[in-house]
A protein has these predicted regions:
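Transmembrane helices and adjacent periplasmic/lumenal helix-loop junctions
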Residues: 257-281, 305, 398-404
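Metal-dependent active-site segment of extracytoplasmic phospho-/sulfohydrolases and closely related
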Residues: 242, 253, 260
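Membrane-interface junctions at the ends of membrane-embedded or membrane-associated helices
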Residues: 88, 245-255, 280-290, 416-442
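The feature captures the transmembrane alpha-helix scaffold of multi-pass secondary transporters
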Residues: 237, 253-257, 273, 388
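Primarily membrane-embedded glycan-assembly and transfer machineries that use lipid-linked glycans
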Residues: 2-242, 280-405, 415-421
């Protein structure tokens, strides 16, 4: 039997054409998740060595404080993991050693022995304000120092609720819940991409768990988690959204929920909404993209309403905290001042500051036009496009940190860990499902 266009029905080339958009035959294409055997000692020993070298150099070059505490613990953890993987050829032991010494040990040490960094303090305070006043932001008259500002969107307060409800010590610290959320979300992302997820494949569950542990144990995520930076859960939610839209055309709603949660927490997630929507328009049609965008926006709106019910009474506080403060347009400036092009231009004076903001806006318009004129065709292309967009944003922003580049690095790492086997010859990030009655299409 053949279709009207002459392609055999049921063949990998068959596609549903709606409004000119060509949709893949999702029954025959699935995301490739790294198999459990690919995470063996032979592949991970060099990575542990690279991680150890990075942590050692970071310990020497860092200015001290929480960063150096993490670097010293992490160096020991990665060296131990590399030695254990090389000597005993195990997977679980070295991974758990790296996670324990690069994340758990320095995090607990910093919680019990060292002062918290600004991020956990801000999140915990916002949760207390939410419970007391229904608004996680201080009013303009109370913004006496830069520490008084809250540059996060309202839903970020959920990580501070344990502290606000009276938990103290490790269980009440924001860093514990940021790390737990990141591990769970990354495991869900890898599990969502497993090729035999629907069949309850034990190997897929194992691969998803160990892939998540390896990702979290890498310096890209473990350093910000240990010192209390809020970016890793946003990265994990973005990876989960990519896994959903790669897995099936029926999952953009789930992807929309994931991106919606991230967008309700931090503005750095907003570009992901635009990039994924553009990819869905090109791949699946405008209707699927509209469902994804609607799910994202509704989720964001609901979460903001729930986590900041008093916000409508003081909208100026929201603008002061999440718009003007990150752009350096308030009386007290953010300490995010890494010597990148945007900050260097902004530091030349008021004219330079306005020029930096204008250049950032021009870059945003340019990326938007690029998405419309040449949208990404698949998930790997979308991940790369998002990495480029975020890199431009962090380079050109008037207030920025080197640590923000964890976003593009993590996205490229996610794309690499879920890439297609080159031997399949299929689209990047996809591989043909096995069919005993028909050879794979090259």
């Amino acid at each position: 039997m053949t279709r009207r266009d002459g392609t055999p029905a049921g063949s990998p080339a068959a596609a549903a054409r709606v409004g000119g958009a060509v949709r893949p035959d999702w029954s025959r294409w699935q995301v490739v998740l790294p198999e459990h055997r690919s995470l063996d000692h032979r592949r991970l020993v060099p990575w542990y060595a690279v991680f150890a070298a990075y942590a050692a150099v970071f310990a020497v070059l860092s200015g001290g404080g929480a960063d150096r505490v993490w670097a010293l613990w992490a160096t020991a953890g990665y060296v131990l993991a590399a030695a254990a993987a090389w000597r005993w050829r195990h997977l679980a032991g070295p991974l758990l050693a790296a996670l324990a010494l690069a994340l758990l040990a320095p995090t607990i040490w910093l919680i019990l022995r060292g002062p918290a960094t600004a991020d956990p303090i801000v999140v915990a305070r916002s949760a207390v304000l939410l419970l007391r006043h229904g608004d996680p932001y201080l009013s303009a008259g109370q913004l006496a120092t830069w520490q008084a500002y809250n540059p996060y969107l309202p839903a970020m307060t959920v990580f501070g609720l344990p502290w606000a409800f009276g938990l103290r010590g490790v269980l009440g610290d924001t860093r514990l819940w940021l790390a737990a959320a990141t591990v769970v979300l990354l495991a869900a992302a890898f599990w969502m991409g497993a090729p035999h997820r629907a069949e309850g494949c034990v190997a897929c569950r194992r691969a998803a768990a160990w892939s998540a542990v390896f990702a979290v144990a890498s310096p890209v995520l473990v350093l910000p988690l240990a010192v209390g930076i809020t970016d890793p859960p946003m990265i994990a939610l973005t990876c989960l959204a990519f896994a959903c839209v790669a897995r099936s055309p029926r999952l953009p709603l789930v992807a929309g929920l994931a991106i919606g949660v991230a967008c309700a927490m931090k503005a750095t997630a907003w570009p992901a909404l635009a990039v994924i929507a553009a990819m869905l328009v090109a791949r699946d049609g405008a209707r699927v993209a509209a469902r994804f965008a609607a799910a994202s926006l509704v989720t964001t709106a609901v979460l903001v309403a729930v986590t900041a019910p008093g916000l409508l009474a003081t909208p100026g506080a929201l603008v002061q905290n999440i718009v003007l403060f990150p752009l350096g347009l308030t009386q007290h400036h953010t300490p995010a001042a890494s010597p990148l092009p945007g900050h260097l231009l902004a530091s030349t004076g008021p004219a330079g500051h306005l020029a930096a903001i204008g250049r950032l806006a021009a870059a945003a318009v340019g990326v938007a036009v690029w998405l419309v004129v040449r949208p990404p065709a698949d998930v790997p292309a979308a991940a790369r496009r998002l990495a480029i967009a975020l890199t431009l944003m962090f380079l050109l922003a008037p207030a920025t940190r080197f640590g923000y580049f964890a976003y593009p690095v993590a996205l490229l790492g996610w794309s690499a860990m879920t890439r297609n086997d080159r031997a399949t010859g299929g689209p990047a990030g996809l591989a043909p499902a096995a069919d005993p009655a028909e050879p794979a299409v090259r």
